């Protein structure tokens, strides 16, 4: 396998541009503006049919080097219309191109996707079938959780587990280990085949959701056979040279059928607050807290029992980052405290003796990521994540006549399941030439589990190497071969 991979790499390297392009280079600079005169950030400026180019920063300025000669300059991005014009690059003078005006394309901006792509691009140019739920759609739907956000999406089916109080989902008719949940491109750990992590994310912190249908096993592993759902969170607005701040709050109340009690108890109750600071030196801070109170739904049941279990969630998060022209580094911590309540009635013989089977979950998710664009040809993404998931089953008995409460001593009535995981990923995107790009990557995952049904504290670790290439001989055709090899212990 390793020999075959090396052969593929050597074949790809054989298409490197001619050494003639390594002549003496001169400096090229300028700035890009929008039609209203504002700086246009993150616009790609390149010389057509070459590997020379750069990207505008937060002030719209760009700078790169290229050999002297006559070229066609291309100014484009997924958020703006493409613009081309002839230029002459000469030695001994300043090659400055001021106030290059581009026209923004709002419709195209809404279709930008990143999941499974070599670089951000419009949805119509993706080789995969990708759907995106953007920030405007999220605001219009006013969801209380991720399930209510995705339950109207085509190809997604939700199912409620009455016994555990959890919601599972299917993508393209496949569920469990065939669908991968990502947060900012990092896999989320789950207790089993049920993807409960999807219901344990704060919907108020989501910028957009990208749904990729079809196999993504080369990049994300064999458990992405049906596809992936990538939850992309809100971050700083980017480097702008100015200090800004924001504060937001949200209160939402809903009935559950005909059942409702104001602010607490029956019905659905959501309160959220978030704040952010962006300093002119590139530092940014974000934080927020959300409370989800689901009073459950009794339906046709009587007494204490509920057809849908009540659930109370507290979600907190914080982020600190630094962003400049070609670098974005950030750390994020998410915390979940979830309680799913299972009240039961007493028996006909002892109606005053009732039991409660509750599920108590705590989840910590740490993420450290860095995006570094070295030049117009090479960019690198580094990611490190530590996740700690703990779920406790607690069964108690209560004597309603005396108020006495005690833990149940029955088998399997008390249980603790815990998973810990380290995940590290490194990917690079290398534009070898105008028609071919290469994306190698390395992923390491270490997982430890323990619980009542697990013998001891076993660990699983695997190291994977993957490489993918994209060859685009014509504008209407793209070919993307890929291979993934892994070692598991």
Which stretches of residues belong to each language-model region?
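Repeated loop/turn-to-beta-strand initiation elements of outer-membrane beta-barrel proteins
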Residues: 282-285, 326-329, 376-380, 434-438, ...
């Amino acid at each position: 396998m390793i020999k075959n991979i090396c052969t593929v790499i050597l074949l790809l390297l054989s298409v490197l541009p001619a050494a003639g392009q390594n002549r003496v280079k001169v400096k090229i600079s300028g700035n890009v503006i929008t039609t209203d005169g504002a700086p246009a950030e993150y616009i790609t400026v390149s010389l057509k049919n070459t590997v020379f180019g750069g990207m505008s920063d937060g002030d719209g300025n760009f700078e790169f080097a290229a050999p002297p000669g006559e070229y066609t300059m291309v100014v484009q991005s997924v958020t703006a219309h493409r613009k081309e014009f002839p230029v002459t690059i000469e030695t001994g003078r300043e090659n400055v191109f001021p106030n290059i005006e581009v026209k923004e394309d709002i419709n195209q901006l809404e279709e930008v996707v990143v999941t499974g792509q070599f670089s951000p691009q419009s949805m119509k140019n993706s080789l995969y079938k990708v759907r995106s739920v953007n920030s405007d759609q999220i605001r219009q739907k006013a969801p209380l959780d991720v399930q209510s956000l995705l339950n109207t999406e085509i190809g997604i089916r939700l199912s409620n587990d009455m016994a555990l109080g959890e919601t599972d989902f299917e993508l393209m008719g496949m569920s469990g280990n065939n669908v991968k949940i990502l947060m900012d491109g990092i896999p989320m750990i789950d207790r089993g085949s049920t993807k409960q992590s999807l219901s344990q994310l704060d919907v108020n912190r989501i910028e957009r959701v990208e749904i990729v249908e079809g196999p993504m096993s080369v990049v994300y592993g064999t458990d992405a056979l049906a596809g992936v759902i990538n939850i992309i969170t809100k971050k700083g607005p980017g480097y702008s040279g100015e200090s800004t701040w924001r504060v937001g709050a949200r209160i939402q109340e809903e009935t559950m059928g005909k059942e409702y009690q104001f602010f607490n108890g029956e019905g659905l109750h959501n309160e959220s607050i978030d704040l952010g600071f962006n300093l002119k030196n590139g530092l940014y801070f974000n934080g927020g807290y959300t409370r989800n109170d689901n009073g459950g739904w009794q339906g046709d049941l009587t007494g204490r029992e509920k057809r849908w279990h009540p659930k109370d969630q507290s979600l907190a998060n914080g982020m600190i980052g630094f962003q400049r022209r070609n670098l974005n580094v950030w750390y994020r911590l998410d915390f979940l405290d979830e309680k799913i309540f299972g009240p039961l009635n007493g028996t006909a013989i002892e109606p005053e003796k009732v039991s409660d089977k509750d599920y108590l979950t705590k989840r910590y998710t740490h993420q450290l990521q860095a995006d570094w664009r070295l030049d117009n040809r090479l960019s690198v993404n580094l990611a490190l994540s530590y996740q700690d998931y703990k779920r406790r089953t607690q069964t108690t008995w209560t004597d309603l006549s005396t108020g006495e409460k005690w833990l149940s001593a029955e088998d399997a009535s008390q249980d603790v399941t815990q998973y810990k995981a380290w995940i590290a990923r490194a990917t690079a995107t290398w534009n070898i030439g105008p028609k071919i790009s290469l994306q190698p990557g390395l992923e390491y995952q270490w997982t430890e589990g323990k619980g009542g049904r697990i013998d001891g504290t076993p660990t699983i670790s695997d190291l994977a190497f993957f490489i993918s290439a994209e060859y685009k001989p014509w504008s209407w055709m793209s070919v993307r071969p890929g291979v993934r090899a892994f070692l598991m212990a």
